[in-house]
A protein has these predicted regions:
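Ribonuclease/tRNase effector modules and their secretory precursors
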Residues: 1-116
């Protein structure tokens, strides 16, 4: 699955998750929940941001069970966030591996390009 297909799948599942009563289409790792609390963000705000996310790094599925990628999106406050998202196509759901605020020392101003 290429980056464009991953982006479409993430956006679709995020939209469907918002419309569902149980929110079971997006799962969160323990690490991601810890980071969410550390950033003082609401889970729903990040999940809503995934509806318009952009894949900025596509990771090869060499040693990983699920294909994953790094996405960029924004909270309603226009604050950018990055999330590593694993895609479970067989179950039609997402796993948020981690979520964080991109730092200026690691990322260019566009939040899409790593500094070298």
């Amino acid at each position: 699955m290429d980056a464009a297909a991953k982006q479409q799948l993430i956006r679709r599942i995020a939209r469907e998750n918002e419309d569902s009563t149980d929110g079971a289409k997006i799962l969160w790792s323990r690490h991601a929940i810890t980071e969410l609390v550390n950033e003082d963000w609401e889970r729903e705000a990040v999940e809503q941001g995934l509806q318009t996310c952009e894949v900025v790094e596509d990771y090869p599925q060499i040693h990983r069970r699920l294909p994953d990628c790094l996405v960029l999106s924004w909270l309603s406050s226009q604050e950018p966030f990055h999330a590593v998202v694993a895609l479970d196509e067989s179950q039609d759901r997402l796993l948020i591996v981690t979520v964080y605020s991109p730092s200026n020392w690691e990322w260019e101003d566009d939040q899409r390009t790593r500094r070298h």
